[in-house]
């Protein structure tokens, strides 16, 4: 009888627990679908749902609490909150010759708090990653509290607060933007003039002042970040290299700066450093990302490390089997490694899943793939698909 009661209790426990777990997952799936819809609207050039999802009360509290902002600046921003947020959001991306599109690559929710990672892609395989802090309103609609922008190396609310403070950089506002509060009046004046150059978008004036800053100020993360952003307009210059050096020395292995570091390293042919920065970025995001794996594969190929290139490309296809660039990376890596049988796997996925025609004429137009066109393994594969 005791055994029967135990079995009955176990059955009752299972009956109670499984539906709750299933319901919780169903709820997360519904929330993800809701958030996907917000990003899809952005992709369709509509900012309305994204703007509605932002918790204005929480966002303004974060912005106004992060810095000393002059009352007239604060008033003007509050009156134009929605349009200001939209302008600042769209200005945060790298320049692109084509439409910038976002993809939700990670979504998690527990209770009333969640987190989503969105990858935005620009032309030239340039990426931006946002990590959104999410909540729910009383009707269980997604609310966006804030986000970390890895391309701009900052939290959105903090960046807005800094921009607003720099609009009228008085002594207290200037001091408040710095991590250390014990600078003397002369040093605060230097930084205030620097912020005016940022506000007026005067890079030459900015560099002139930055080069004369007291040594102690060159540990301030905000100043180093702005210096890198201005210097990246001239990536081949010694100034850009020095800006990167200052950041790396002051904040080694800091994920927040890793994406901008990656761009610099790729543009200057420092491919091993690019791979290391991308690894730091993935660790910061807390995910395996197909686009990052593809970039690692390309960097490894540029160094002639075909085995590593194949490994990174495979990681990309496992992380995101529906991401087209992952399969292109695997195709190029296996072709370079002369693994032609393996290359046909990627060819098949590109044809079957993404609608490409991988015929000989197509391959010959690609300098990395033209060797395949006359290869017997490829020709047998091509014949088998006729």
Regions found by a protein language model. Name each.
Residues 22-46, 175-190:
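Short, low-complexity N-terminal intrinsically disordered segments enriched in polar/charged residues
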Residues 29-31, 111-113, 124-126, 182-191, ...:
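Generic helix N-cap/helix-start motif at coil->alpha-helix transitions
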Residues 68-195, 199-217, 238-241, 246:
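Long, contiguous interaction/recruitment modules in multidomain scaffold/adaptor proteins
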Residues 203-204, 237-238, 271, 306, ...:
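TPR-repeat structural position
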């Amino acid at each position: 009888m005791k055994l029967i009661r135990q079995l009955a209790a176990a059955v009752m426990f299972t009956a109670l627990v499984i539906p709750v777990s299933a319901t919780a997952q169903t709820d997360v799936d519904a929330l993800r679908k809701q958030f996907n819809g917000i990003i899809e609207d952005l992709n369709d050039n509509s900012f309305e749902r994204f703007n509605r999802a932002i918790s204005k009360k929480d966002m303004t509290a974060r912005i106004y609490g992060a810095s000393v902002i002059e009352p007239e600046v604060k008033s003007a921003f509050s009156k134009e909150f929605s349009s200001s947020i939209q302008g600042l959001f769209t200005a945060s991306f790298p320049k692109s010759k084509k439409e910038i599109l976002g993809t939700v690559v990670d979504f998690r929710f527990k209770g009333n708090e969640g987190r989503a990672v969105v990858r935005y892609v620009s032309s030239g395989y340039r990426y931006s990653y946002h990590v959104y802090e999410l909540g729910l309103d009383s009707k269980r609609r997604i609310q966006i509290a804030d986000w970390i922008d890895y391309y701009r190396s900052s939290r959105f609310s903090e960046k807005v607060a800094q921009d607003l403070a720099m609009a009228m950089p008085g002594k207290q506002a200037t001091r408040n933007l710095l991590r250390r509060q014990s600078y003397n009046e002369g040093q605060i004046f230097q930084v205030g003039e620097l912020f005016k150059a940022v506000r007026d978008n005067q890079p030459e004036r900015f560099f002139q002042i930055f080069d004369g800053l007291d040594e102690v100020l060159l540990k301030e993360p905000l100043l180093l970040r702005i210096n890198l952003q201005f210097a990246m307009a001239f990536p081949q210059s010694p100034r850009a290299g020095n800006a990167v050096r200052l950041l790396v020395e002051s904040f080694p292995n800091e994920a927040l700066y890793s994406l901008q570091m990656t761009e610099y390293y790729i543009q200057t042919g420092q491919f091993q450093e690019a791979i290391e920065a991308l690894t730091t970025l993935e660790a910061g995001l807390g995910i395996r990302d197909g686009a990052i794996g593809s970039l690692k594969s390309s960097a490894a190929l540029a160094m002639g490390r075909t085995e590593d290139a194949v490994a990174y490309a495979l990681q990309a296809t496992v992380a995101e089997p529906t991401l087209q660039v992952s399969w292109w990376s695997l195709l190029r890596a296996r072709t370079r490694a002369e693994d032609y049988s393996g290359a046909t796997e990627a060819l098949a996925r590109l044809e079957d899943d993404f609608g490409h025609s991988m015929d000989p004429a197509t391959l010959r137009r690609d300098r990395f793939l033209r060797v395949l066109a006359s290869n017997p393994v490829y020709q047998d594969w091509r014949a088998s698909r006729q």
